[in-house]
Amino acid sequence: QVWRVNNFDTISLLKACNQGCKYATNSMESLYPHIKSKDLRKVIDDYNTQHIEIGDKCHEMLNVVHADEKDPKPMASMFAKMSIDLKMLADSSDEKVAELMFDGCNMGIKTVGKCLNKYTSASGGSKGIAKDLIDVEKNFANNLMEFL
C-alpha cells in the first residue's frame, strides 16, 4: 500500500490518533485492578488490543517519514491517572469502570472527529485509520452499555 504521508495534515492526524490510542490504553490499564467482572474485563481487553493495533499502524506510518510519535504529556497522563484513582475511591464498581470508559469513548470520537475535519489534506490512509479508530470507539461504547 502506498501512502502520501509526507504532509503536515497527514502527520498531524496520525500523531493525534496515536496519542489518543495511548491515552485509551493507559486508562484501560489503570482501571484493570478495579474490574471485578470477567465479562467486562474481556470487553476491555479486546478493545485495549484494538487500540494497540491502531496505535502500531500510526507508528509504522509515522516511521515512513521519520516523524516522531506524539506521546501524551506526562502531566496530563499523571492527572488522568489521579483522576481515575480518585473516582474509583468514591465508587469502585464495575458500573463506574464502564462509565469512565464510556466517557473516554465519547471523548475519543469527538477528538478524532475534530481532527478529521481539521486535517482535510491528510492522506486517505491516515483518514482511514482515524475512521477505524472512531468505529472502534463507537463499538466499544456500545459494548459497554450492558455494564452501565
Language-model regions, residue ranges each:
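Alpha-helical bundle segments that constitute or directly flank the non-heme di-iron/ferroxidase center
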Residues: W3-I35, K96-T120
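Alpha-helical scaffold segments that form or flank carboxylate-/histidine-based iron centers
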Residues: D9-C17, K38-D56, D94-L100, G124-V136
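Generic structural concept
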Residues: N18, K22, Y32, N48-I52, ...
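A structural signal for well-ordered alpha-helices, especially hydrophobic packing surfaces
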Residues: T25, G55-L62, S83-L86, A90, ...
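Residues at alpha-helix boundaries and short interhelical turns
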Residues: I35, I52, H66-E69, T120-G124
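Conserved alpha-helical segments that form or flank metal/cofactor-binding pockets of metalloenzymes
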Residues: R41-M75, L144-L148
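Carboxylate-rich helix-loop segments that flank metal/cofactor sites and access channels
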Residues: E60-I109
